Amino acid sequence: MKLWKRLLAIPIAASLVMGLLPAPALAEDTAHSHPICGEAHTDIGDHTGDNCKDATWTAWDGTSTITYDTNNTAYVYLEKDATRESRLEVKAGYTLYLCLNGQKLESSLTSSASQGMSQVINVSNGAKFILCDCKGGGTITHSSGAKGKGVRVGGSDPAAATFSMYGGTISGNHADDPRSGAGGAGVEIQNGTFKMYGGTISDNYEENAGSNYGGGGVCAHTSGTFTMYGGIISDNQSVTDAGGVTVV
């Protein structure tokens, strides 16, 4: 009987010891899947469940080259705060879905020759850019001392570019645009379309070095169009016309 009790005590003691050991760290869940408009789908304006789908998003460090699929489309989420030394280009014929994932994407470009045009993201004519933020708090901005726009949509080519904003914040951009007939420190639209469904455009400043249209938050000009279904535009400034929004 004593021998049986001793043998029984061995596995019990081992179990108690194992219970005191720290649990192994679980691998971080890198799966990132949600609708194209954010954490959960919301009908707003012309964006309905009929044209919204769940997508699987690939991690992106914010500075490396984005890989597009055979349809020239990419779904990426920002895995950490990132500082770029060049603007992110969405080229003609390509579609980029970017989830900020609560992180900050900023530009540190300070070249005096390109201050006014050193936008964080450039959406070329014929390209599509879709922005969301599943966690909230994600920002597109410039680092301290750097000047430029948040997002520029289109250009002189009449082939329209499109930008759809469902979430995220475009803030802290200080544009010193030397071109005549331009503007927009947060978002500039030229021969393009910008639809804002959510998110925030705030605290951007259009210094307006040239004779341009102003629009500290948003400027749509030269056949550019801006439709606002939701979101917030606030506390933007311009030396000349319209601190918030200019449409000409």
Where in the sequence are the language-model features?
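Beta-strand-rich solenoid/repeat architectures in extracellular/passenger domains
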Residues: 102-116, 134-148, 161-162, 166-183, ...
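Extracellular beta-strand-rich solenoid/capping regions of secreted or surface-exposed proteins
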Residues: 83-97, 107-133, 141-163, 179-181, ...
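Bacterial N-terminal signal peptides
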Residues: 11-19
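Bacterial N-terminal signal peptides that target proteins for export
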Residues: 1-11
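Extracellular Ser/Thr- and Pro-rich, acidic-biased low-complexity repeat/linker "stalks"
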Residues: 28-45, 136, 164-169, 195-200, ...
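Acidic Gly/Asp/Thr-rich repetitive segments characteristic of extracellular carbohydrate-active
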Residues: 30-87
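Sec-dependent signal peptide cleavage junction
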Residues: 18-32
